[in-house]
């Protein structure tokens, strides 16, 4: 039996790599860079997997443990206290001649926006599955997000040391729940003591990790002739057969080879890389991050199978050698101020460089840093394909596209349009240039709707300004946090993705800004939609500071989900509309759309409604602010005529419980206006209920579920849209909004 020992992450070698990273790796060619995200359902072991990667790569000297609160990537106080990832964090490390920029993302549904922004910055992802649970609710969510970005991915089935882990079930889940095309590169085996080892399908080797040195060593053993070897050879043949069906190069080799046994391992790996990059297959690996098994081979797979930056994002070739960068995260450091994480798509960013956002904001990069969660190493320049932290950017927000100049952006847009075979703008005439830039380059952030809102008050009047500044900074970091001012109550109002999201915001304001704010009771973020189309005209004439202000506007509201603002192009109205300057149209549009943010019944956003401008007459010398205010008043007047209906947020739940508890749980759900979609078997003793229910009926539901099931049930929940309400429920919602219930 042949044995080979491999030692990864030795401190001497690690020290050398850290020195080298300041020379070679920060300037490494794009082909040697891997920008990856780590995605998972909460508690699948994602952060532990990341911490093991850092340890074996020599970036850390000790193993970070979630339960000990000493992790590198979960560095916020709230993350370490709760044992969950809240903010995406970026770390850079060297592994086998490659530079890996890794983003650890949240697994909780309240922080989906963090995941969404991070996926703009990566070229591939590792999806971590809990080997005892398979594909879970948030796994489906992050998988869908990865599909949207067309990201190649690897699967790491974690916790395979556990006695209740089921590898075959995980593979079945991938096929059934995600409609994925998994190819297994490894299979689990356990010795007489139940210690996990791995059989490698490509090399036909047994991999065993040594626990006495924290898994830094692992042994590769060629399997001797046996039933086990024959079974593994059959799996290797199946892998070759699968790959040859999707990869022509390997198919040609297979046709000219007398036996699958003669197909070289390197040919299989190259075919696997091509098929993974083309989203034809998803390689599956396994291990146990907590027990230090399988992590080095996972990092090898990242290098071998996930794409380099140069293999993706060809749309940005229109920038040539000029800078194009995507802002995917902003954090605030007590010493350094706002730090902006940028994925460099083209060109090179240097210290002291002047950059322009697609919104036209000019910025100067004061310093550049290499990321390691909340630690930083200063560098002078970073090239295309890499990830960098920029200090000194004052007005840039998460989701911005950065370039070297406005002319660079315009020239890139022109070249892109020419390459697409069109010289005309693909954006409607009313949209502005920044919106066109974001849309054309696929960077338009999809900010999810808030499902909860509450008032926020400072502890004293003197703290008001500091609180507002803290909220501005938090909004730059987190676009899903909504901050507005209620002119009726005079309160500042927060909108967020869930109870945990709002709780974390309050906690961060206290811990990071030393302001003990008071949050009002959580309110449901209802929406409104018009009951029927309506048309009205509003004419306003005033004298302000000696100047005559005169505006007359005719607007119509109609039911339409496709477009929020349009011009009525009927023959009787076009002569008037053609006389309006583009700037005036933009002012009218901004004022009218702004009025839809607060509906007449509960102050909810008015949706599925189109504003149709019929006619507008603007007196000479009338201020833009007066035109905007009149447009808003006209929309409010039409809303009072059309009337509105309430739409309530609906949540999708997956509840897993023992079979004998299901009837009691379903009886309780029926009292909460829930719609049961399905009840499925979940293992031998459990069942899973798939259900949709109004968010208003789910206050305190996790506690109620624990009581009903005597602590045996588990639940995941995520928003799944809005639904119309009946008149009784509408009246109750209005009373809640008015504080009468």
Curated annotation (Swiss-Prot):
Q: Where is the tr-type G domain?
A: 31-310
- Give the signal peptide range: none
Q: Keywords on this record?
A: GTP-binding, Mitochondrion, Nucleotide-binding, Protein biosynthesis, Transit peptide
**PROSITE patterns xrefs:** G_TR_1, G_TR_2
**What is one cellular component GO term in this UniProt entry?**
mitochondrion
> Which residues are the transit peptide here?
1-29
Q: What does this protein do?
A: Mitochondrial GTPase that mediates the disassembly of ribosomes from messenger RNA at the termination of mitochondrial protein biosynthesis. Not involved in the GTP-dependent ribosomal translocation step during translation elongation.
UniProt protein name? Ribosome-releasing factor 2, mitochondrial
The gene coding this protein: mRRF2
């Amino acid at each position: 039996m042949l044995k080979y020992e491999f030692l990864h992450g030795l401190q001497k070698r690690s020290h050398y790599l850290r020195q080298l990273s300041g020379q070679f790796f920060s300037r490494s060619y794009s082909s040697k860079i891997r920008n990856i995200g780590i995605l998972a359902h909460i508690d699948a072991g994602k952060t532990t997997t990341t911490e093991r990667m850092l340890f074996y790569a020599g970036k850390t000297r000790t193993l970070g443990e979630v339960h000990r609160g000493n992790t590198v990537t979960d560095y916020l106080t709230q993350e370490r206290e709760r044992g969950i990832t809240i903010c995406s964090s970026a770390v850079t490390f060297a592994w086998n001649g490659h530079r890996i920029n890794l983003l650890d993302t949240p697994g909780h549904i309240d922080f989906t926006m963090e995941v969404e922004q991070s996926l703009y910055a990566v070229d591939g992802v590792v999806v971590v599955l809990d080997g005892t649970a398979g594909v879970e609710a948030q796994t489906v969510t992050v998988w869908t997000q990865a599909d949207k970005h067309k990201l190649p991915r690897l699967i790491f089935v974690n916790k395979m040391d556990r006695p209740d882990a089921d590898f075959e079930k995980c593979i079945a889940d991938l096929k059934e729940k995600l409609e994925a095309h998994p190819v297994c590169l490894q299979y689990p085996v356990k010795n007489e003591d139940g210690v996990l080892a791995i059989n490698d399908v490509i090399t036909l080797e047994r991999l065993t990790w040594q626990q006495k040195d924290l898994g830094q060593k692992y042994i590769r053993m060629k399997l001797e002739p046996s039933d086990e070897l024959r079974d593994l050879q059959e799996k290797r043949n199946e892998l070759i057969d699968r790959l040859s069906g999707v990869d022509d190069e390997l198919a040609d080799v297979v046709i000219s080879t007398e036996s699958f046994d003669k197909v070289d391992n390197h040919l299989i790996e190259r075919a696997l890389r091509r098929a993974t990059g083309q989203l034809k297959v998803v390689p599956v690996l396994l291990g146990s991050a907590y027990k230090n098994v399988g992590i080095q081979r996972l990092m090898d797979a990242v290098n071998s199978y996930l794409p380099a930056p140069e293999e993706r994002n060809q749309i940005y070739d229109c920038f040539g050698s000029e800078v194009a960068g995507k802002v995917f995260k902003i954090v605030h450091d007590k010493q350094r101020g706002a730090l902006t994480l940028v994925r460099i798509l083209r060109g090179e960013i240097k210290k002291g460089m002047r950059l322009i956002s697609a919104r036209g904001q000019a910025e100067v990069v004061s310093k550049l840093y290499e990321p390691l969660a909340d630690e930083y190493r200063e560098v002078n320049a970073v090239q295309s394909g890499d990830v960098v932290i920029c200090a000194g950017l004052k007005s840039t927000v998460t989701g911005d596209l950065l370039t070297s100049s406005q002319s660079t952006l315009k020239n890139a847009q022109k070249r892109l349009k020419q390459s697409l075979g069109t010289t005309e703008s693909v954006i409607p005439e009313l949209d502005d240039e920044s919106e066109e830039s974001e849309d054309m380059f696929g960077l338009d952030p999809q900010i999810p709707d808030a499902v909860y809102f509450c008032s926020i008050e400072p502890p004293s009047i003197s703290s008001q300004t500091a609180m507002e500044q803290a909220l501005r900074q938090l909004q730059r970091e987190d676009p899903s946090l909504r901050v507005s001012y209620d002119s009726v109550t005079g309160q500042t109002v927060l909108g967020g993705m869930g109870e945990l999201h709002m709780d974390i915001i309050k906690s961060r304001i206290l811990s990071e800004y030393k302001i003990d704010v008071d949050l009002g009771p959580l309110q449901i973020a209802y929406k409104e939609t018009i009951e029927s189309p309506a048309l009205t005209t509003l004419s306003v004439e005033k004298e302000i500071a000696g100047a005559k202000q005169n505006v007359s506007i005719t607007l119509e509201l109609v039911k339409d989900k496709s477009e929020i603002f349009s011009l009525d192009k009927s023959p009787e109205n076009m002569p008037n509309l053609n006389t309006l300057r583009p700037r005036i149209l933009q002012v009218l549009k901004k004022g009218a759309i702004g009025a839809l943010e607060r509906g007449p019944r509960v102050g909810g956003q008015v949706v599925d409604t189109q504003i149709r401008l019929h006619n507008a007459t603007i007196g000479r010398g009338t201020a833009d602010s007066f035109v905007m205010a009149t447009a808003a008043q006209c929309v409010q007047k039409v809303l009072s005529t059309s009337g509105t209906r309430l739409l309530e947020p609906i949540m999708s739940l997956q509840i897993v419980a023992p079979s004998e508890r299901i009837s009691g749980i379903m009886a309780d759900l029926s009292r909460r206006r829930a719609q049961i979609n399905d009840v499925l078997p979940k293992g031998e003793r459990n069942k899973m209920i798939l259900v949709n229910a109004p968010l208003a009926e789910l206050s305190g539901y996790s506690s109620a579920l624990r009581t009903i099931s005597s602590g045996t049930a588990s639940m995941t929940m995520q928003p799944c849209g809005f639904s119309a309400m009946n008149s009784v429920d509408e009246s109750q919602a209005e009373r809640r909004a008015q504080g009468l219930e």
